[in-house]
Amino acid sequence: ITVDLEEYPVQEGSILLILPGQVHSIEQYLDYKMEYINIIFKLEMLLAKQTDICNSRYFTPLLDGTLRLTTHFTPGMPFYNEVAGCINAADEVCRTNPPAFQLVIKGQLFLLFSILISNCCETSASRKNQKSLEKMKRIIKYIETNYASKISIEEMADALDLSQSHFMKFFKNTMGTTF
């Protein structure tokens, strides 16, 4: 699995945290098969309607990318059991739907982010990686906006203010395939 241009080899029990705005993809390794579960929710559901300390100190920095969390958790890592416990508890509540289950889910998400922010913050990505990531986001946005038309290499290079050869080299080096 690749998140923000960094590859993470996964194994049974792996947990990957992908925040809003992070570019991510899944690629099969050789002929191995993998089963996975996505748990998707809007981080905004945890935001208070009015500005509070949780919004300003934790959630806003997560949303704008200035606070980065560990992406990949595997069994045996510090805090893996706590992270997995929150996810499993929320999953079990979704499965059984007891009265007021929404409150339990929200509580588990707050607990999860408390564990992550207290123990699993990372330093920012390198400047070079950040620039490549921003270029990739521009490419993806351009493709999303113009997906109904045929997009040429020349058009894509112009959109990024790059020469065609530089665009092709960048895309191949970053994505591992031609445009």
PLM ranges: what are they?
Residues 23-92:
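A hydrophobic/aromatic-rich effector-binding and dimerization subdomain
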